[in-house]
Amino acid sequence: MESLSSLYRDHIATLQQRTREILQRQQLEGLLIHAGEPISRFLDDHDYPFKVNPQFKAWFPVTRVPHCWLWVDGVNKPKLWYYLSIDYWYLVEPLPDSFWTPYVDIVPFADPDEIAALLPPRDNVAYLGSSPHRASLLGMERDFINPQPVLDYLHYHRAYKTDYELACMREAQKSAVNGHRAAKEAFLSGMCEFDINIAYLSACGHRDTDVPYDNIIALNEHAAVLHYTRLDQHTPEHVMSFLIDAGTEYNGYAADLTRTYAAQKDSDFAALIAAMNSEQQALIATIETGVNYIDYHLQMHGRIAKLLKQFDILSGLSEDAMVTEGLTLPFLPHGLGHPLGLQVHDVAGFMQDDRGTSLAPQSRYTHLRCTRVLQPRMVLTIEPGLYFIESLLAPWRANTFGRHFNWSRIESFKPYGGIRIEDNIVIHDNHIENMTRALKLE
């Protein structure tokens, strides 16, 4: 594989080309990209964990240092004003010296309020960042603060990963897979959710503030809460299932993986997990360029109908009728997946072009996060689920179609919560790369 340095050189060239294009289109002279500022807790002297502007970390892996500024014009070498505070209370991140630093001019400064005097004139420059107030203090007018046409263009093209970005995402997969394996062992040894999470973080080398989203570590019926993050400190008396949805970051790029396990390998739930895994892999085998992601979401509902019929959860209707009448929806209430990259739910999932044209999902699939036609270099998650959630099932009990639900069978599955299996894939011209399965995470 090429060195990260050479991949990064080409990555910067791509970002520079995109910058030239949008500056010319909007008649701008440059982009001023702000890393962001710490946010203090209300009536407190502590800050929330700092999360960098994704538009900033697209250019280089500076993810922990607030108050930094980047100036790009698509022609000259990108210029980074790097916040190097003088502080004895907190650790000061040293001036970077890494594979990416030869491609950037770095200017250290110690006082965030100095920046106005350090920056070039800003009369025809767009500010991209989370602090419009700071931009106003720099004399920038409202129309130049996060202008939508600039954001639309940059967001749209972020879907197409450079080779550098793909290399970073493959590295993120490796650490996430290490964490998932450690978490599975912790589950099998009888640990509680809290301790399973610690095992995961330790294996990944991440703190809980480093992971790209709050880990979902769910035993038993907790798996029926889609974004369950409580982390119980007591192991249930009868452990039946384990769902883990957890990721990592590498150079600012995310991995997002999910697996579900049964405590008893000979249970019906274990068989349902195995069948779901087969359907997920079969769906991935059908993915190709030029097809809208919506089509695969609809295909998965057909596969869910097949499972519901196979396991006697629904009966008396064809699989097509189950989908048409919405009977699969309470079992799979979320979308098939989403774009992945600098953010877990990466931007522009609905954008059809780089001018902001949006295509919303069908009204019955409001939680689908991607309606784009799949093209090479896109990275997406494929994460079908099958859950037993009473609040979603309850309306069907008195419904005309309620007789098609095997309610006693559903009650027997409720203590397991549900299933989700998630891989991260890359679209290539002639094949689909499953980054997760390539590392043998089963």
UniProtKB/Swiss-Prot annotation:
The keyword Hydrolase applies. Keywords: Dipeptidase, Hydrolase, Manganese, Metal-binding, Metalloprotease, Protease. GO terms for cellular component: cytosol. One of its GO terms (molecular function) is metal ion binding. Gene3D superfamilies: Creatinase/methionine aminopeptidase superfamily, Creatinase/prolidase N-terminal domain. Its cofactor is Mn(2+). It comes from the Bacteria. This is Xaa-Pro dipeptidase. It comes from Sodalis glossinidius (strain morsitans). The gene is pepQ.
